[in-house]
UniProtKB/Swiss-Prot annotation:
Protein name per Swiss-Prot or TrEMBL: Envelope glycoprotein B
GO biological process: one example: symbiont entry into host cell
Quaternary context: Homotrimer; disulfide-linked. Interacts with host receptor MYH9/NMMHC-IIA. Interacts with host receptor MYH10/NMMHC-IIB. Binds to heparan sulfate proteoglycans. Interacts with gH/gL heterodimer.
Topological domains, Virion surface: 31-774
GO cellular component terms, A-Z: host cell endosome membrane; host cell Golgi membrane; host cell plasma membrane; membrane; viral envelope; virion membrane
Signal peptide: 1-30
Residue numbers spanned by region Disordered: 31-88, 470-492, 883-904
Stretches for region Involved in fusion and/or binding to host membrane: 173-179, 258-265
Pro residues bias spans: 476-485
Protein species of origin: Human herpesvirus 1 (strain Patton) (HHV-1)
Pfam families named among the record's database cross-references: Glycoprot_B_PH1, Glycoprot_B_PH2, Glycoprotein_B
């Protein structure tokens, strides 16, 4: 009958266990024994290198037929072996055989005994023939080489461009008496004509002050400062960015002259030349400037090398291509040494210029991502797998190569791949390997293009060369050339690359684990199959020695078996409870001196209350119904027999004591399965596109656009200068224009006149400003009040002088004369009665002469101013007057001098 998988799985274990036990018995029997020397246990320990333990002493045997022996105290643990000299002292304290058996049964309650009747041949079995084992999995077709991995180029094409435009600002201002107000500001940008760019800006570094442009289909012209057209010098911008420079013609906005209560207009034309960065992305049909302005024309458009087929959205007269163009640095005025082909395009808002270059090889849709020094290529089914431990990645491709002609704008792939491969080969493989053929290109999943250069070691190369020469000798001399490749007419395409490499890394991990597990399981399957075939031979031989054990291990339960030729007859064994089995304490045959049983005798019952059956203990807890296992008695007899869950020890054919399985050293028959554990592998960070590449992939750099727009006023305008409204500006402008028209003499006179007028205006303006100040008005008011007070007192003094000159001129003298306490005055008055007429006349004469002296001094002073003749006349008059004064005037003695001095 067929057996299940668990039974077949335990066969090899049982066979090796039997062989191990047989080896142990042979070693024990071959070891020399003497009285007092241990038996099997000693042999086992000696074989293991340990010290020999003395055998325990023989115990007194209990009566054979007594099923219920006298109960003594039960020890908790098995009694350890004791020296032979202590047998007489410890014999009384040992437990009987049945008590020890009960202890064994209590410790191993799951140990059962079996009664196996002899097979009759009703059921026969045979062993399976050896199986054919699977072959060892062969390795894949691995090829080592160098690889360069390309990814989609998401970076835009960048180039330098120059913008030419004129900022036109028209401001409307209303001027009041004390303030001005903007009523409107119109701002626009006008392109610079081609002729002005070439003949004025690039040739001389100047720009016209007018801007002529079209708005609403009407051509209009703006004049800077509302004046005639002139050439204005271009000067560098105030603040330059990191990536561009700029030049312009004016800093300040022009405001109209002040005329109160009128609306005035002023025009400013600022010519600006600005270097900017330009960007264009695939398919390069347009480009955008750093200012945010779009140009709907391919940067590769032109009239050379078929570039006129590129995209453009402008009319032909708006574009111009100049060959042999020498650019000029507007800061240093230096001219470029090498000519270029210059493209110029005018738009409604600006004119842009850039250097023309051919489209190939200026741009490439693929870019190099990784250079891999060691790349293994293996074939799995219908695909190639490229694996590299350096980047922990596996790429899956088709078996066919990918033609580079299908890659749109892929001229850089072959050159970059060859350069990188040559550099790696020269550095690492030049002395050990050779290149096999030309680089091969494969398109991997995810949009990665792999350039692969197979390598071959020098040793293998010699073998392949010899084989190749043999193959070439067998080929026909003129082979048919292959048909032209279909890729010549294949349509081009752009390869799209994913932004994540995680799928390739997962593929690498899966391949790594799959390769390891498959190899390990393959080795296990082969070893298992070969082991089963080897064990089958042992099973066939072992069944002849012990068919019961072989049959039980094969069937999976306890059976009895015997060989019937080449087949084995089996019968089922009957289980017997451990409590119903009793072992006898002696193995000697009383009726036959010198003969002993080779196995212990037992008594058992099939059921608890059944009759007692006599038998013999077989191997592996088998209860034999016969007692025919006999052998001659020997001196130094020591045996261990399996009994339930432990062992019973017989010495000199008599029971000694019991042992548990843990007391016996175990010799393992298992074969260790050598399985290589999965090695550790660390993943390195890997990015397809860096943060900078993703940020730079767009057509517009919004950060740069915002920066430039916010810096525009700072670069091309003076934001710190403040122009105040001036009411006299119109008058000065008119005077200046009047004198300018009179030539050089008029300009000289105009400067003098305008200087005088400016001084007067400044003085008046200063006074007006001082009066408009609150503190100034207060000071003027105080000065006016002080002046009025001074005028009042002066007027009063003059009136007093006219009414009473003496009192006004000599107030103290007059006061003394009127004082009645003066004795001189009172006495003289009383004596004379009135004033002295002579003195009064003299006083009048003195006053008259004083007036005459004053008149003479004035005459002399005027004569000095007029000249010599007047001075002589004044001298003559003075002499005449002196002559008269000497004749008529006589000095009056001063009689009252002392009195006057006392009064004073």
């Amino acid at each position: 009958m067929r057996q299940g998988a668990p039974a077949r799985g335990c066969r090899w274990f049982v066979v090796w266990a039997l062989l191990g036990l047989t080896l142990g018995v042979l070693v024990a029997s071959a070891a020399p024994s003497s009285p007092g020397t241990p038996g099997v246990a000693a042999a086992t320990q000696a074989a293991n290198g340990g010290p020999a333990t003395p055998a325990p002493p023989a115990l007194g045997a209990a009566p054979t037929g007594d099923p219920k022996p006298k109960k003594n105290k039960k020890p908790k643990n098995p009694t350890p072996p004791r020296p032979a000299g202590d047998n007489a002292t410890v014999a009384a304290g040992h437990a009987t055989l049945r008590e020890h058996l009960r202890d064994i049964k209590a410790e191993n309650t799951d140990a059962n005994f079996y009664v196996c009747p002899p097979p009759t041949g009703a059921t026969v079995v045979q062993f399976e023939q050896p199986r054919r084992c699977p072959t060892r999995p062969e390795g894949q077709n691995y090829t080592e080489g160098i690889a360069v991995v390309f990814k989609e180029n998401i970076a835009p094409y960048k180039f330098k461009a120059t913008m030419y435009y004129k900022d036109v600002t028209v401001s409307q201002v209303w001027f009041g008496h004390r303030y001005s107000q903007f009523m409107g500001i119109f701002e626009d940008r006008a392109p610079v004509p081609f002729e002005e760019v070439i003949d004025k800006i690039n040739a001389k570094g100047v720009c016209r002050s007018t801007a002529k442009y079209v708005r609403n289909n009407l051509e209009t012209t703006a004049f800077h400062r509302d004046d005639h057209e002139t050439d204005m010098e271009l000067k560098p911008a105030n603040a330059a960015t990191r990536t561009s420079r700029g030049w312009h013609t004016t800093d300040l906005k022009y405001n109209p002259s002040r005329v109160e209560a009128f609306h005035r207009y002023g025009t400013t034309v600022n010519c600006i030349v600005e270097e900017v960065d330009a960007r264009s992305v695939y398919p390069y049909d347009e480009f955008v400037l750093a200012t945010g302005d779009f140009v709907y024309m391919s940067p590769f458009y032109g009239y050379r090398e078929g570039s006129h087929t590129e995209h453009t959205s402008y009319a032909a007269d708006r574009f111009k291509q100049v060959d042999g163009f020498y650019a000029r640095d507007l800061t240093t005025k230096a001219r470029a040494t090498a000519p270029t082909t210059r493209n110029l395009l005018t738009t409604p808002k600006f004119t842009v210029a850039w250097d023309w270059v051919p489209k190939r090889p200026s741009v490439c849709t693929m870019t190099k991502w990784q250079e891999v020094d060691e790349m293994l290529r293996s074939e799995y089914g219908g695909s190639f797998r490229f694996s590299s431990d350096a980047i922990s990645t596996t790429f899956t491709t088709n078996l066919t190569e990918y033609p580079l002609s299908r890659v749109d704008l892929g001229d850089c792939i072959g050159k970059d791949a060859r350069d990188a491969m040559d550099r790696i080969f020269a550095r690492r493989y030049n002395a050990t390997h050779i290149k096999v053929g030309q680089p091969q290109y494969y398109l991997a999943n995810g949009g990665f293009l792999i350039a692969y250069q197979p390598l071959l070691s020098n040793t293998l190369a010699e073998l392949y060369v010899r084989e190749h020469l043999r193959e070439q000798s067998r080929k026909p001399p003129n082979p048919t050339p292959p048909p032209p490749g279909a890729s010549a007419n294949a349509s081009v395409e752009r390869i799209k690359t994913t932004s994540s490499i995680e799928f390739a890394r997962l593929q690498f991990t899966y391949n790594h684990i799959q390769r390891h597990v498959n190899d390990m399981l393959g080795r296990v399957a082969i070893a298992w199959c070969e082991l089963q075939n080897h064990e089958l031979t042992l099973w066939n031989e072992a069944r002849k020695l012990n068919p019961n054990a072989i049959a039980s291990a094969t069937v999976g339960r306890r059976v009895s078996a015997r060989m019937l030729g080449d087949v084995m007859a089996v019968s089922t064994c009957v289980p017997v409870a451990a409590d119903n089995v009793i072992v006898q304490n002696s193995m000697r045959i009383s009726s036959r001196p010198g003969a002993c049983y080779s196995r212990p005798l037992v008594s058992f019952r099939y059921e608890d209350q059944g009759p007692l059956v006599e038998g013999q203990l077989g191997e592996n807890n088998e209860l034999r119904l016969t007692r025919d296992a006999i052998e001659p008695c020997t001196v130094g007899h020591r045996r261990y027999f399996t009994f339930g869950g432990g062992y019973v020890y017989f010495e000199e054919s008599a029971y000694s004591h019991q042992l548990s399985r843990a007391d016996i050293t175990t010799v393992s028959t298992f074969i260790d399965l050598n399985i290589t554990m999965l090695e550790d592998h660390e993943f390195v960070p890997l990015e397809v596109y860096t943060r900078h590449e993703i940020k730079d992939s767009g057509l517009l750099d919004y950060t740069e656009v915002q920066r430039r727009n916010q810096l525009h006023d700072l670069r091309f305008a003076d934001i710190d200068t403040v122009i105040h409204a001036d009411a006299n500006a119109a008058m000065f402008a008119g005077l200046g224009a009047f004198f300018e028209g009179m030539g050089d003499l008029g300009r000289a006179v105009g400067k003098v006149v305008m200087g005088i007028v400016g001084g007067v205006v400044s003085a008046v303006s200063g006074v007006s400003s001082f009066m408009s100040n609150p503190f100034g008005a207060l000071a003027v008011g105080l000065l006016v009040l002080a002046g009025l007070a001074a005028a009042f007192f002066a007027f009063r003094y003059v009136m007093r002088l006219q009414s009473n000159p003496m009192k006004a001129l000599y107030p103290l003298t007059t006061k003394e004369l009127k004082n009645p306490t003066n004795p001189d005055a009172s006495g003289e008055g009383e004596e004379g009665g009135d004033f002295d007429e002579a003195k009064l006349a003299e006083a009048r004469e003195m006053i008259r002469y004083m007036a005459l002296v004053s008149a003479m001094e004035r005459t002399e002073h005027k004569a000095k101013k007029k000249g010599t003749s007047a001075l002589l006349s004044a001298k003559v008059t003075d002499m005449v007057m002196r002559k008269r004064r000497n004749t008529n005037y006589t000095q009056v003695p001063n009689k009252d001098g002392d009195a006057d001095e006392d009064d004073l």
